[in-house]
């Protein structure tokens, strides 16, 4: 299991939350999302758990930490797969923007990749047109990623098309909403469990009435 993340420093993360949030509030929300994500991955049965970080962040006990490499997001994604696991090891990568993800989501993705006759890849579509999870039976398949435009409303479709052009059988996972805007933050917080750090952070830093529509 890989988690691709960015150090939650004010001004570097979740800038689309500002306004209505301040940079400090956005960083606290990002830190909570990352903490929830790492907690969930820690609860998911996996041969290894690796935090691939831009910046610095303390990984949970038993995790490995690797730096991100590459310029574009596509390059960093491909390098994360290449750096983290040996060839022919089923690997699932997620980011830090879906703190509502469950261990069940992740375990199901890994199981699909390890059963005989299962798919070559699993892709979790995001509601905004991107994707929240990518799992590969062989991490070498990630070589298709640098050529895909990221952070657009067509990234998910382009990724699916690229995997299929590679000749891969792809299983689609449950769509999830990721956190880009203040409205996303409120919606995702409502989908998180009561003990969620993310939900608590959103509740603690609620903007004024009507601001979530921005």
Regions found by a protein language model. Name each.
Residues 1-16:
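N-terminal nucleotide-binding beta1-loop-alpha1 segment
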Residues 28-46:
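A short, N-terminal amphipathic alpha-helix
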Residues 52-58:
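Short, polar loop motifs at secondary-structure junctions
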Residues 61-92, 152-155:
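Short phosphate-binding loop-to-helix
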Residues 94-96:
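Active-site acidic Asp-centered loop
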Residues 101-129:
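Conserved donor-nucleotide/metal-binding helix-loop-beta segment in metal-dependent transferases, i.e.
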Residues 139-162:
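Short, glycine-/small-residue-rich phosphate/pyrophosphate-handling segment
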Residues 158-214:
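Conserved alpha/beta core of the MobA/IspD/sugar-nucleotide pyrophosphorylase nucleotidyltransferase superfamily
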């Amino acid at each position: 299991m890989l988690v691709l993340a960015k150090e939650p420093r004010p001004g570097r993360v979740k800038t689309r939350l500002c306004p209505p949030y301040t940079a400090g509030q956005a960083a606290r929300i990002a830190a909570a999302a990352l903490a929830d994500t790492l907690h969930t991955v820690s609860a998911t049965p996996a041969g290894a758990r690796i935090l691939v970080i831009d910046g610095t962040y303390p990984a949970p006990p038993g995790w490995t930490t690797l730096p991100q490499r590459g310029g574009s997001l596509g390059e960093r994604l491909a390098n994360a797969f290449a750096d983290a696991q040996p060839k022919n090891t089923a690997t699932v990568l997620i980011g830090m923007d879906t703190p509502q993800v469950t261990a069940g989501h992740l375990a199901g993705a890994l199981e699909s990749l390890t059963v005989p006759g299962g798919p070559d890849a699993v892709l979790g579509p995001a509601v905004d047109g991107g994707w929240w999870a990518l799992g590969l039976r062989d991490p070498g398949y990630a070589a298709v990623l640098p050529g895909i435009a990221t952070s657009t409303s067509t990234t998910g479709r382009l990724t699916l098309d690229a995997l299929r052009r590679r000749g891969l059988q792809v299983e689609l996972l449950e769509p999830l909403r990721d956190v880009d805007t203040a409205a996303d933050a409120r919606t995702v917080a409502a989908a998180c469990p009561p003990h969620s750090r993310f939900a608590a952070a959103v509740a603690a830093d609620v903007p004024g009435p009507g601001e979530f529509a921005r």
